[in-house]
Amino acid sequence: LSNDFASDMRVYENDDSLLMKNFMLAALYSIEQLQAHSHLSIEDSAFFRGELERRYQKIRSIPASKELDEFASCTVGKNIFGCQNHSYGYAHVRALYGHSFEGHEDVEFGEAMFRFAIDDLSEDGALWREASRGAWSWKYTAIALGQLLSISEISRVSGSNVVEYRSPISGYTIHDA
């Protein structure tokens, strides 16, 4: 890893934050597979963890990645950066990082974001916070759903099973989205 590749971001700018999020997902999934097949030494794992940790802390600092109530305060026309698929993506990074490096709090955050999304479905099963961005944003609904399903798989392999979650608020499951 280059010491500066995907190592900094301006919190309210998509270009560098998306680069960092996507880099983190690719790196974490790669490390997960290398670890699963015993292709990383303890030293290699420590090196990668050190390189990823400082990048990860930047992602954790994004308002909608820290607190679900920040995400819940997103409304039409209000931009707290990451009210839609971006927040699901950051929760995906947090859950995967937690699974890879035994950060149960981070896996739980991903699960909480998953449950929030299901609780928040509109009557027609739409992720309305995504849809409220305008007609062009509908194409991002698939991205948001993919992030949520990835979180549910991380939850499953971590010993939980949010994919079966039925919202006590909306009555929906992920299958209704």
Model-found features: residue ranges?
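Aromatic-lined, polymer-binding surfaces characteristic
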Residues: 1-160, 171
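Acidic/histidine metal-binding catalytic segments
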Residues: 163
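CBM-like carbohydrate-recognition segments
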Residues: 166-177
